[in-house]
Amino acid sequence: MTTSRIDIFKQMLASDPANSAVLFGLAKEYEKTDATAEMIETLNRYLAAADDEGNAYGMLARAYEKLGQRNEARQAYERGIQAAASHGHPGMAEEYRSILSDYED
């Protein structure tokens, strides 16, 4: 029986539940398999443990959009703008601002 990458990441987290690199890797695996709810839960755990530079907030926002949760997506993009700007990623911050401009009603 082959062990999936998701199972491997889960095993790694069992010994170190706050390992931000493993949490991010697990979230990426959930993204690949369209496990959106699990991806959101894992990204929120990651963001609680890591000083993200903005990328995870964009992933989180897109996951919320996929579930039709625009308010949560907006909040994630806004936090992503702040993170990207504070870490010197103006292009990412501008991308998120552009997406949010489409949210204007």
Identify the role of each PLM range.
Residues 11-14, 44-48, 82:
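Conserved structural position within tetratricopeptide repeats
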Residues 70-89, 101:
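TPR/TPR-like (Sel1-like) alpha-helical repeat modules
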